[in-house]
Amino acid sequence: MPSAIPPSATTAAIVPIRAFQPDLHERAWASTPHPTLPLLATAHAKSVTVFSLSSLSSHSSLTGGHTRSVRTAAWKPGLPPHKLCLVSGSFDATAGLWRWDGDSAAADPDAANHENTDSPLEIEITASTRAKSRRINDDDDDSDASQTGGDQDWEFTLVLEGHDSEVKCCAFAPSGAYLATCSRDKSVWIWEDIGASEADDEWETVAVLNEHEGDVKAVAWCPDVPARNARRQYSADVLASASYDNTVRIWREDSDGEWVCVAVLEGHEGTVWSIEWEQRPAPDGRFPRLLSCSADGTVRVWELQQDEGGEEAEEGQGGNGADGAAGRLALGGIPNTMRTSLREEWRCTAVLPAVHDRDVYSVSWSQKTGLVSSTGRDGKIVLYQECRDRSSAARAASTEVRSQNQPESNISDASQTATSVTSPSSSQGTTWEVLTSLVNAHGPFEVNHITWCRRYDVAAEKRGEDEMLVTTGDDGIVRSWEVKR
């Protein structure tokens, strides 16, 4: 394992920073940080409130697009800083596409004259809250504007229809070309952006996946890290879905452009509420791991079992040279008649220490530190740390010392023995420990969601680099927390 993983846990404390303002005064479902900007989108009631991570206060609101509660929101990645795109998923069985053009910094002459040390990005976010003069649509009359509601900087541009019941979750692929939505109707839909330009907003359904046997609670795309391209018989995009049927499914697009289920992850004894991919690239080139949390009170870590022999065999098939390459398929280079089975083996390599005594609703994996956070129905926040297994580390060190005096023919045997010693919970010779926990994070209320995000507030030592936790609860309050170690 990389040296970044410490040999043992250290003490830590979860300390409140302050709640985002204003309070939402009704159940809030989830808060999603923008991938690059200091913005946080919180789904609640029939709207989405966008908070500034700089001021920890409201930046703008998206209202009028849905007839029932908004359950989820996702930012589209890859856009310039002055343009925003967000998808909201609602209990009204639709997903809505919203756009915001933030060229308002130029429209606010005061923004350029402020004596302030904020970055241009910070000035732009601040200025955008002042300049609310742009109409949502130049062709709308006053009645249409009042019906749309919310801040006039946001334009509700498209409704995605097709689900038969509540949309539980939505997520963009890392490229932004695909959008996944899931629903109480037991299906996962994949939509593709087919517009000629970003402003076209033309999306078509490319897959409807119906293999789950219960409500689909969550979808998550594998992050864009080098290791995700290792499986050459598929495209680079990998989607995971979690369900009321107690399973997680892994989906990939095959060489014929069909989305197929390549693995079913079984082990939970209750609804799988949430999933999240490992965010940090693994130094050893390992495929990203996956976290899942469940109504059974557990958090599990899943890992793809790499088949190196199979990968090497694939590389050797399909002919050599330009003629051979031309005759191969674009994905993997294996003719249909020679392709291996579209299946992957995933194993549960860890069940994190039991702390929660009720449903675990949400988990989050820090990209910066590798810490895992969880929360749920019991109102607790729990932090976990992955550590080198002490017995494995000791044996490896002992073997290294012994091997210095052994003949070369015996060194490989000794090394093989050392690397095969792993903890019961992990194939990587690591264990998971509870770093700290906090009870009653939102008082007597359930906590529905937790996420890591970067800090931009004035109290941060390194704005844009430091991390904090954000929790969202039934009390309608979005809270920020610092992890002190």
Task: For each feature predicted by the language model, list its residue ranges.
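WD40/WD-repeat beta-propeller blade N-cap
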Residues: 21-28, 63-70, 113-118, 153, ...
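WD40-repeat beta-propellers
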Residues: 48-52, 95-99, 188-193, 219, ...
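Loop/turn segments within WD40 beta-propeller blades
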Residues: 31-37, 74-83, 164, 170-177, ...
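Blade-level signature of beta-propeller repeat domains, shared across WD40, Kelch, NHL, RCC1
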Residues: 451, 462-485
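A short helix->beta-strand "capping" segment at the edge of beta-propeller domains
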Residues: 2-26, 55-57, 149-157, 343-349, ...
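Short loop/turn segments immediately following beta-strands, especially the blade-tip
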Residues: 100-147, 192-200, 252-257, 303-342, ...
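Conserved strand-to-loop turn within each blade of WD40 beta-propeller repeats
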Residues: 43-45, 88-92, 175, 181-185, ...
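Beta-strand-rich domains and repeat architectures in extracellular enzymes and scaffolds
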Residues: 20-46
